[in-house]
């Protein structure tokens, strides 16, 4: 646990090093110290086999890095920062889509790259991991703000990535919109998902939503029917019987 003074110093140091636009941070002493700490955290995580336990450990470790992240996002000018990019990925692993999106806006604006052996580009990685985080939440019956999902789609709209990856995010966005009662919005995202990936597994849901949204024929007004007039029947005896004379 860091003290308020340590957190402040960490935030200021992060801001100062991140202002070295286009300059490698490996020469920044504080940055090097933080990389040593990050490497130790990563070794701790590597020793954990369970994905669930690993996510819980990341959730425990993340608060330490918050001052660094805040310092970079507030005053940074786009220098490559492996700490920031690692924290973005950890936030996604713990289901913090909003927190990861906060970093992604900065990272994509300045063209930061993923550290180490990551082969996916940041937009590709971010889109896929947001989709997976949202899918995990949906499977657990948890809610996700669909505005975070649609912003992710907009933020990465021009980036190159496998169509199947973008389809995943459209699919889960559509499912959350459906659950929220937005049938039209859900249909649009599910249709886009199947356009990108015919194996997206949403065809039946699309058919159901199309039936739901199909205009129902208005009931025709019933024609007014007149009741037949009752005629007074006259018996044959009455027709031939003479009227009584007055006495």
Curated annotation (Swiss-Prot):
Biased composition (Basic residues): 227-247
Location of the DNA-binding region in this protein: 214-245
Function: M protein is probably an endonuclease which directs cos cleavage. The Q, P and M proteins are needed to package DNA into proheads and for the conversion of proheads to capsids.
Organism lineage: Viruses, Duplodnaviria, Heunggongvirae, Uroviricota, Caudoviricetes
An individual GO BP term: viral capsid assembly
Superkingdom classification of source: Viruses
Species assigned in the record: Escherichia phage P2 (Bacteriophage P2)
This protein's name: Terminase, endonuclease subunit
GO molecular function, one term: endonuclease activity
Family, similarity comment: To phage HP1 protein ORF19.
Entry keyword set: DNA-binding, Endonuclease, Hydrolase, Nuclease, Viral genome packaging, Viral release from host cell
Biased composition (Basic and acidic residues): 209-219
Location of the region described as Disordered in the Swiss-Prot/TrEMBL record: 209-247
Keyword Signal: no
Cysteine pairings via disulfide bonds: none
């Amino acid at each position: 646990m860091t003290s308020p003074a340590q957190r402040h110093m960490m935030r200021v140091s992060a801001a100062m090093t991140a202002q070295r636009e286009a300059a490698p941070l490996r020469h920044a002493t504080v940055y090097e110290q933080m990389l040593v700490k990050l490497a130790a955290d990563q070794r701790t995580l590597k020793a954990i086999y369970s994905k669930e336990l690993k996510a819980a450990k990341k959730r425990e470790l993340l608060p330490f890095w918050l001052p660094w992240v805040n310092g970079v996002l507030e005053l940074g000018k786009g220098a490559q920062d492996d700490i920031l990019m690692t924290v973005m990925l950890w936030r996604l692993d713990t289901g913090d889509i909003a927190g990861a999106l906060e970093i992604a806006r900065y990272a994509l604006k300045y063209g930061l790259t993923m550290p180490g052996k990551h082969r996916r580009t940041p937009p590709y990685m971010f889109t896929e991991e947001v989709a997976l985080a949202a899918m995990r939440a949906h499977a657990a019956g948890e809610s996700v703000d669909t505005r975070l999902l649609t912003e992710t789609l907009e933020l990465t709209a021009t980036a190159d990535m496998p169509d199947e990856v973008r389809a995943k995010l459209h699919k889960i966005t559509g499912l959350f919109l459906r659950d929220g009662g937005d049938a039209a919005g859900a249909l649009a995202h599910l249709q886009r998902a199947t356009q990108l990936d015919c194996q997206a597994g949403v065809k039946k849901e699309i058919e159901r939503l199309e039936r739901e949204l199909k205009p129902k024929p208005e009931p025709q007004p019933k024609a007014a029917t007149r009741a037949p007039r009752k005629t007074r029947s006259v018996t044959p005896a009455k027709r031939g019987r003479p009227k009584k004379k007055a006495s």
